[in-house]
Amino acid sequence: MLSRYNPADIEAALLQARGELPFPPGHRREDWAKAASALGGPLCSALLAAAERASASQPAPLPATLWLECKRTGQRETYERPRAARRQALANLALAECLEWEGRFLDAILDYAWAICEESSWALPAHQLDLADVDDPIIDLGVAMTALELAELDHLLGERLEPALRRRIRSEVDRRCFRPYLARHDFWWLYNTARRDVNNWNAVCNGGVVGAAIYLEKSPARLAAMIAKAARSLDDYLATFDEDGGSSEGPGYWSYGFGYYTVLAHLVESRTDGQVSFLDEEAIGQIARYPLRTVLSPGRYVNFSDCSRNVHFCRAHLAYLGRRLGIPELEGLANVQPLQPEKESLTWALRSLFCRPDPAAAAPTPAPHDYFRGMQWMIARYDPADPEALVLAAKGGHNAEMHNQLDVGSFIVHLAGESLVAELGAGRYTRDYFGPQRYEHLAASWLGHSVPVANGHGQLPGKERRATLIAHIASPAEDCLALELREAYPQEAGLASLQRRIYLHREPPAGWVELEDLARFGSGPGMLESPLITFAQVELGPGYVLLRGSRACLRVQYDEAALKVRVEEFANVDLAEGPQDVRRVAFSWRAPSREGRLHLRLIPGQG
């Protein structure tokens, strides 16, 4: 447990340590020349060009009425986009100045950094709908990330910054972050409570605030108190992972939350000469391997809950973890991630220059079988060495997970780099998507998932709405996940039992997926429907349905005598990655029955 670290021992470690930080300030020209050489001419040029564009412009205005757009209309982007543009410009300017060290970006850095310090709040309006009360600052994701970015700006440029700006950074970070962090215990993201559990916010907020303190806080006692508080808090974050290192938030939020956990761990180890380590916990190795175990095909990952369908990891995060923990596969995965420092935050762009993967590390090959026991996630691969081969991902779990969707029993069928039976990922992030109307959005509702419908009733939210594991089988011939789903449904559904069994069979030439739903109704005959959610084109034939994607085709075979099928179209569904047409292919019994079976065979490449 990280809470074994108490303030007294941490303060002693701080006083004994040399206190070196992992990233060189800009005046260490030899280090920066090596970084520029490793980055390469084209990427350096792109970074300098981005800085020149920022230098030729002014910080985008952020008027109070723009803040209120989220409260008034529910839209977040109108404020978040110009806010993010300010921080991106500052990151590019700071790194360009460190690469050149000629002073030509210093005035623009002053303008952008001063404008950020002038913001009434660094929070996001979605997290604080009313205009900010400057006398009662909150700490959210935006506050914590901004604090770390300004602290690292100060570290990199030091005395080249205007003295007043350096004083302002310290004053603002102390007022907005350090004082409320030490004084308050009621931020929802700090600890697991009876009201709610923590999620990625815990790691990001702790990482940003305490990471900034490692750079800026001069009092060893005060810094020790913050590190100790973070240690206790981060124990609750680590508890959100299951015993196999799985996070129900998905790979995208793993990258975000565990990324900031790693940022803080790196800084704490450096500042204490390794006497305080957040990476020596037994669970860390399993958590670090999570992206290796959730891959569907290169660049595509299991995207249950609000996870994006297109996940990119921070190269520096994977590279550092791989080297620090002795997991070379993470360095191999880092090598196939995009490197675009001019599009990254200062936090990650800086690390991309100095935490580089071994270029000889090969892209990893996943295992045939992966299973996360606590979450009841199964990933089964027909041929892990073939990136085009069939992959099945299925889940149990419950309906109060982090970034929850009503998806107990849902699954993905992935072939040739695309999911033909798909998860929609997140809906567009708006005020309502995170409010009482969340489950009215197709992406979060049972209607937008490949889960059964009993007597017209879908699943309900709540931790008690869960799957019970019947069996998980992983063998050379097949993988199977068998679940009892009855508790996910309301009493009105009339279910005595609803079992789902889903298999990946490894029969040549390409394998196939089998879906078997077994329903028993308690009070009388009932109806069962099992849909497939897809972005693919749908073609109906006698006893089969074709799901035709851009690169592959899946043939869904069913018994016409027992089942009927209908196709529902949802045009321009408002998803986080943009509007997209979605199709729901619903198979159902032809007549009500007290009990029965719904059986589908999903066969690759039979178009």
Regions found by a protein language model. Give the residues of each.
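Non-membrane alpha-helical segments in proteins
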Residues: 85-99, 111-115, 144-155
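Carbohydrate-active enzyme catalytic cores, enriched for enzymes
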Residues: 258-420, 474-475, 591-592
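Extreme N-terminal leader/anchor segments
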Residues: 1-47, 84, 95-98
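Long, well-ordered core segments of solenoidal/helical folds
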Residues: 51-62, 109-125, 168-192, 225-245, ...
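Solvent-exposed loop and edge beta-strand segments that line ligand/cofactor-binding
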Residues: 21, 74-87, 98, 126-143, ...
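Structural helix-adjacent loops and short alpha-helical linkers that scaffold large soluble proteins
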Residues: 97-110, 153-174, 213-231, 268-284, ...
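Active-site lining segments of carbohydrate-active enzymes
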Residues: 131-252, 263, 350-363
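CBM-like, beta-strand-rich accessory domains located in the C-terminal region of large
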Residues: 129, 144, 331-343, 429-607
